[in-house]
Swiss-Prot record:
Described function: Voltage-gated sodium channel inhibitor.
Protein name: Mu-scoloptoxin(15)-Ssd1a
Expression (tissue specificity): Expressed by the venom gland.
Family: Belongs to the scoloptoxin-15 family.
CC per GO annotation: extracellular region
Higher taxonomy: Eukaryota, Metazoa, Ecdysozoa, Arthropoda, Myriapoda
Keyword annotations from UniProtKB, A to Z: Disulfide bond, Ion channel impairing toxin, Neurotoxin, Secreted, Signal, Toxin, Voltage-gated sodium channel impairing toxin
Signal sequence, renumbered to the chain: 1-20
Location relative to the cell: Secreted
Superkingdom of origin organism: Eukaryota
């Protein structure tokens, strides 16, 4: 249910246009190429621990890092 709510928020945010890119801390995982779901979880965790005015919108992963696009309010 938690992921359903997150995906609903993501779908709504895709219609907005004011985005900035921020890099969250490296994924703590033995796999150097994390899966998309691991990346999404890392982004969601970063949001939960971080600034409540920034909501993860889209997720990409590269090497150990997960890059999140966040809406700037």
């Amino acid at each position: 249910m938690k992921f359903h709510i997150i995906f609903c928020l993501l779908a709504a945010l895709m219609m907005t246009s004011a985005f900035a890119e921020v890099t969250v801390e490296p994924l703590r995982h033995s796999n150097k190429n994390p899966t998309e779901s691991e990346c999404k979880k890392a982004c969601a965790d970063a949001y939960a621990k971080g600034d409540q005015s920034k909501i993860p919108e889209a997720h990409n992963f590269r090497d150990y890092y997960c890059n999140c696009h966040v809406i700037v309010q």
